[in-house]
Amino acid sequence: MEDLKKVVAYKAVDEYVQSNTTIGLGTGSTVFYVLERIETLMKSGKIKNLVCVPTSIDTEMKAKSLGIPLTGLTKNLKIDIAIDGADEVDSDLNLIKGRGGALVREKLVAANTACFIVIVDESKMCEDGLGTTGAVPIEILSFGYEMIIESLLKISALKNCTYKLREKDGEIFITDNHNYIVDFFFETPIENLVKTCEQIKMTTGVVDHGIFANMASIALISKSNGTILTLNKNK
Protein backbone atom coordinates (compact mmCIF):
# COMPACT_ATOMS: atom_id res chain seq x y z
CA MET A 1 0.00 0.00 0.00
CA GLU A 2 2.91 2.36 0.69
CA ASP A 3 4.04 1.94 -2.92
CA LEU A 4 0.60 3.03 -4.13
CA LYS A 5 0.74 6.11 -1.90
CA LYS A 6 4.19 7.03 -3.16
CA VAL A 7 3.31 6.62 -6.83
CA VAL A 8 0.19 8.80 -6.62
CA ALA A 9 1.93 11.47 -4.54
CA TYR A 10 4.80 11.73 -7.01
CA LYS A 11 2.32 11.87 -9.89
CA ALA A 12 0.46 14.78 -8.29
CA VAL A 13 3.63 16.78 -7.78
CA ASP A 14 5.05 16.04 -11.22
CA GLU A 15 1.81 16.94 -12.98
CA TYR A 16 0.45 19.86 -10.98
CA VAL A 17 3.18 21.59 -8.96
CA GLN A 18 4.92 24.41 -10.84
CA SER A 19 7.49 27.08 -10.07
CA ASN A 20 6.39 30.45 -8.66
CA THR A 21 3.28 29.05 -6.97
CA THR A 22 1.83 28.62 -3.50
CA ILE A 23 0.86 25.07 -2.54
CA GLY A 24 -1.43 23.93 0.26
CA LEU A 25 -0.03 20.84 1.94
CA GLY A 26 -2.37 18.37 3.60
CA THR A 27 -1.61 15.99 6.43
CA GLY A 28 -0.88 12.28 6.61
CA SER A 29 1.36 9.54 5.29
CA THR A 30 0.56 10.13 1.62
CA VAL A 31 1.38 13.82 1.92
CA PHE A 32 4.82 12.98 3.29
CA TYR A 33 5.60 11.51 -0.13
CA VAL A 34 4.43 14.80 -1.67
CA LEU A 35 6.96 16.61 0.51
CA GLU A 36 9.65 14.14 -0.44
CA ARG A 37 9.04 14.71 -4.14
CA ILE A 38 8.91 18.50 -3.79
CA GLU A 39 12.26 18.44 -1.99
CA THR A 40 13.83 16.39 -4.80
CA LEU A 41 12.53 18.69 -7.54
CA MET A 42 13.58 21.82 -5.67
CA LYS A 43 17.10 20.52 -5.14
CA SER A 44 17.38 19.62 -8.82
CA GLY A 45 16.21 23.09 -9.84
CA LYS A 46 13.14 21.81 -11.68
CA ILE A 47 10.89 23.74 -9.28
CA LYS A 48 11.81 27.22 -8.07
CA ASN A 49 10.24 29.94 -5.94
CA LEU A 50 7.75 27.60 -4.31
CA VAL A 51 6.09 28.34 -0.99
CA CYS A 52 3.79 25.98 0.91
CA VAL A 53 1.01 26.28 3.47
CA PRO A 54 1.00 23.37 5.97
CA THR A 55 -2.26 22.14 7.50
CA SER A 56 -0.79 20.64 10.66
CA ILE A 57 2.17 20.84 12.99
CA ASP A 58 3.31 17.41 11.72
CA THR A 59 3.37 18.61 8.11
CA GLU A 60 5.07 21.85 9.12
CA MET A 61 7.84 20.01 10.96
CA LYS A 62 8.41 17.57 8.11
CA ALA A 63 8.51 20.35 5.52
CA LYS A 64 10.95 22.39 7.59
CA SER A 65 13.23 19.37 7.98
CA LEU A 66 13.36 19.09 4.17
CA GLY A 67 14.04 22.79 3.65
CA ILE A 68 10.70 23.53 1.98
CA PRO A 69 9.70 27.23 2.33
CA LEU A 70 6.50 27.76 4.33
CA THR A 71 4.00 30.52 4.97
CA GLY A 72 0.85 30.92 7.02
CA LEU A 73 -2.71 31.32 5.81
CA THR A 74 -2.88 35.11 5.62
CA LYS A 75 -5.52 37.53 4.36
CA ASN A 76 -4.32 38.15 0.81
CA LEU A 77 -2.63 34.82 0.18
CA LYS A 78 -3.46 33.09 -3.10
CA ILE A 79 -3.16 29.30 -2.87
CA ASP A 80 -2.75 27.98 -6.40
CA ILE A 81 -3.35 24.33 -5.57
CA ALA A 82 -3.75 22.17 -2.47
CA ILE A 83 -2.77 18.51 -2.33
CA ASP A 84 -4.09 16.19 0.36
CA GLY A 85 -5.09 12.61 1.01
CA ALA A 86 -8.51 11.38 2.12
CA ASP A 87 -9.99 8.58 4.20
CA GLU A 88 -12.89 8.00 1.80
CA VAL A 89 -13.78 9.27 -1.68
CA ASP A 90 -17.05 8.75 -3.53
CA SER A 91 -17.72 8.92 -7.27
CA ASP A 92 -18.74 12.60 -6.99
CA LEU A 93 -15.43 13.47 -5.27
CA ASN A 94 -17.05 14.03 -1.90
CA LEU A 95 -14.65 13.06 0.88
CA ILE A 96 -14.29 11.91 4.44
CA LYS A 97 -11.17 13.36 6.02
CA GLY A 98 -9.79 14.03 9.46
CA ARG A 99 -9.01 10.62 10.88
CA GLY A 100 -5.52 12.01 11.37
CA GLY A 101 -6.92 14.87 13.42
CA ALA A 102 -6.21 17.89 11.17
CA LEU A 103 -9.61 18.33 9.51
CA VAL A 104 -10.23 22.01 10.32
CA ARG A 105 -6.97 23.33 8.91
CA GLU A 106 -7.24 20.95 5.97
CA LYS A 107 -10.71 22.22 5.16
CA LEU A 108 -9.71 25.86 5.56
CA VAL A 109 -6.87 25.47 3.07
CA ALA A 110 -9.01 23.41 0.68
CA ALA A 111 -11.73 26.06 0.76
CA ASN A 112 -9.26 28.79 -0.18
CA THR A 113 -7.49 27.23 -3.13
CA ALA A 114 -8.22 27.44 -6.82
CA CYS A 115 -7.70 23.69 -7.24
CA PHE A 116 -7.99 21.02 -4.52
CA ILE A 117 -6.30 17.77 -5.57
CA VAL A 118 -7.01 14.59 -3.63
CA ILE A 119 -4.54 11.70 -3.77
CA VAL A 120 -5.53 8.22 -2.59
CA ASP A 121 -5.03 4.54 -3.26
CA GLU A 122 -7.92 2.46 -4.56
CA SER A 123 -8.89 1.18 -1.10
CA LYS A 124 -10.26 4.64 -0.26
CA MET A 125 -12.88 4.63 -3.02
CA CYS A 126 -16.46 4.21 -1.76
CA GLU A 127 -18.76 3.90 -4.75
CA ASP A 128 -21.86 3.22 -2.63
CA GLY A 129 -21.53 6.29 -0.42
CA LEU A 130 -19.48 7.72 2.41
CA GLY A 131 -19.16 6.95 6.08
CA THR A 132 -18.93 3.18 6.49
CA THR A 133 -15.20 2.36 6.50
CA GLY A 134 -14.33 4.13 9.73
CA ALA A 135 -14.82 7.24 11.82
CA VAL A 136 -16.50 10.39 10.58
CA PRO A 137 -14.78 12.98 12.78
CA ILE A 138 -16.30 16.16 14.16
CA GLU A 139 -14.07 18.71 15.86
CA ILE A 140 -15.77 20.36 18.82
CA LEU A 141 -14.93 22.76 21.62
CA SER A 142 -13.65 21.17 24.80
CA PHE A 143 -15.91 23.47 26.83
CA GLY A 144 -19.26 21.76 27.30
CA TYR A 145 -18.28 18.90 25.00
CA GLU A 146 -20.80 16.45 26.49
CA MET A 147 -23.63 18.90 25.79
CA ILE A 148 -22.35 19.45 22.25
CA ILE A 149 -22.39 15.70 21.62
CA GLU A 150 -25.96 15.48 22.90
CA SER A 151 -26.96 18.20 20.44
CA LEU A 152 -25.28 16.33 17.59
CA LEU A 153 -27.22 13.18 18.42
CA LYS A 154 -30.46 15.05 17.66
CA ILE A 155 -29.47 15.35 14.00
CA SER A 156 -31.40 12.81 11.93
CA ALA A 157 -28.38 11.26 10.21
CA LEU A 158 -26.50 10.87 13.50
CA LYS A 159 -29.29 9.48 15.70
CA ASN A 160 -28.44 5.82 15.14
CA CYS A 161 -24.67 6.25 15.11
CA THR A 162 -22.30 5.05 17.76
CA TYR A 163 -19.70 7.60 18.80
CA LYS A 164 -16.50 7.93 20.77
CA LEU A 165 -14.52 10.88 22.05
CA ARG A 166 -11.12 10.44 20.44
CA GLU A 167 -8.22 9.47 22.68
CA LYS A 168 -4.48 9.14 22.23
CA ASP A 169 -2.18 7.30 24.63
CA GLY A 170 -5.00 6.97 27.14
CA GLU A 171 -5.79 10.69 27.18
CA ILE A 172 -8.35 12.80 25.34
CA PHE A 173 -6.89 13.71 21.94
CA ILE A 174 -6.25 17.44 21.53
CA THR A 175 -6.15 18.92 18.03
CA ASP A 176 -3.61 21.50 16.87
CA ASN A 177 -6.40 24.03 17.51
CA HIS A 178 -6.75 22.82 21.14
CA ASN A 179 -10.15 21.23 20.57
CA TYR A 180 -11.62 17.73 20.95
CA ILE A 181 -12.72 15.32 18.23
CA VAL A 182 -15.77 13.08 18.52
CA ASP A 183 -15.80 10.20 16.05
CA PHE A 184 -19.15 9.01 14.70
CA PHE A 185 -19.59 5.56 13.18
CA PHE A 186 -22.23 4.81 10.54
CA GLU A 187 -23.60 1.37 9.68
CA THR A 188 -24.91 2.59 6.32
CA PRO A 189 -23.74 5.36 3.98
CA ILE A 190 -24.56 8.91 5.04
CA GLU A 191 -27.87 10.03 3.58
CA ASN A 192 -28.61 13.60 2.49
CA LEU A 193 -24.91 14.42 2.61
CA VAL A 194 -25.09 18.17 2.02
CA LYS A 195 -28.00 18.67 4.43
CA THR A 196 -26.20 16.62 7.09
CA CYS A 197 -23.08 18.76 6.62
CA GLU A 198 -25.10 21.91 7.16
CA GLN A 199 -26.84 20.56 10.26
CA ILE A 200 -23.57 19.47 11.85
CA LYS A 201 -21.84 22.77 11.12
CA MET A 202 -24.77 24.78 12.53
CA THR A 203 -24.63 22.95 15.87
CA THR A 204 -23.36 25.30 18.56
CA GLY A 205 -19.92 24.21 19.74
CA VAL A 206 -18.96 22.45 16.52
CA VAL A 207 -15.81 23.83 14.93
CA ASP A 208 -16.08 21.75 11.75
CA HIS A 209 -16.50 18.19 10.49
CA GLY A 210 -14.67 15.73 8.27
CA ILE A 211 -17.21 15.63 5.44
CA PHE A 212 -15.74 17.54 2.50
CA ALA A 213 -18.72 17.88 0.16
CA ASN A 214 -18.24 19.51 -3.26
CA MET A 215 -14.73 20.69 -2.44
CA ALA A 216 -12.33 18.50 -4.44
CA SER A 217 -11.46 19.50 -8.00
CA ILE A 218 -9.45 16.43 -9.00
CA ALA A 219 -8.86 12.98 -7.51
CA LEU A 220 -5.89 10.81 -8.41
CA ILE A 221 -6.45 7.16 -7.49
CA SER A 222 -3.51 4.78 -7.47
CA LYS A 223 -4.52 1.25 -8.47
CA SER A 224 -2.87 -2.07 -7.72
CA ASN A 225 -2.47 -2.81 -11.45
CA GLY A 226 0.00 0.06 -11.69
CA THR A 227 -2.30 2.65 -13.25
CA ILE A 228 -3.49 5.97 -11.86
CA LEU A 229 -7.10 6.96 -12.45
CA THR A 230 -7.84 10.69 -12.70
CA LEU A 231 -11.32 11.91 -11.81
CA ASN A 232 -12.20 15.52 -12.60
CA LYS A 233 -15.09 17.23 -10.85
CA ASN A 234 -15.88 19.24 -13.96
CA LYS A 235 -16.37 16.19 -16.18
Where are the language model's segments positioned?
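N-terminal active-site beta-alpha-beta segment that forms phosphate/nucleotide-binding
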Residues: 1-84
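Conserved phosphate- and dinucleotide-binding cores of soluble alpha/beta proteins
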Residues: 3-7, 57-235
